[in-house]
Amino acid sequence: MDEQSTLRVGDRYQYAGFWSRVGAAVIDTVIICVLTYPILVAVYGWAYFDSDAVIQGGTDFVLSWLFPLIAVLSFWVYRQATPGKMAIRAKIVDANTGDKPSLRQYLIRYLGYIVATLPLGLGILWVAWDKRKQGWHDKLANTVVIGDKERTAEVAFSSNSDT
């Protein structure tokens, strides 16, 4: 990051940490499962979950591979975050400028999840040790995930919500 972006990001934002990102991923996974599993069970029956096949048919390909790709990329392009990241008030930004990433960066980031998960998830776990909290998918796409420093600032328990 250049000095100006570092100051801007450092003043208001912090890198989203490992556990908050795990929470965001759980939220996203639950949403995808709630939307796709009923259809998969209706089409393939409960035996779908017992199969060793990576793809069991056209419906499986669309719901298990294509739908998540389109949904995630759409949220990233239009909101810079999936519902899980929005829940933790985090967003994806270009690691150099702090601006919205390009579509190319988003595609690299999405495909980078494959690289990050193959060696026993080490590329995902990397977020826990990296000083900028980047997983391998972030490093490949040159992105970082940032969140508001004061995540509870909008929560108010009295009539005075300015404090």
Model-derived features: where do they sit?
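Short, small/hydrophobic-residue-rich motifs at membrane-helix boundaries and re-entrant hairpins
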Residues: 1-121, 139-142, 146-163
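Juxtamembrane helix-boundary/capping and inter-helix hinge elements in multi-pass membrane proteins
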Residues: 97-98, 131-133
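Glycine-rich flap/beta-hairpin and adjacent strands of clan AA aspartyl proteases
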Residues: 119-132
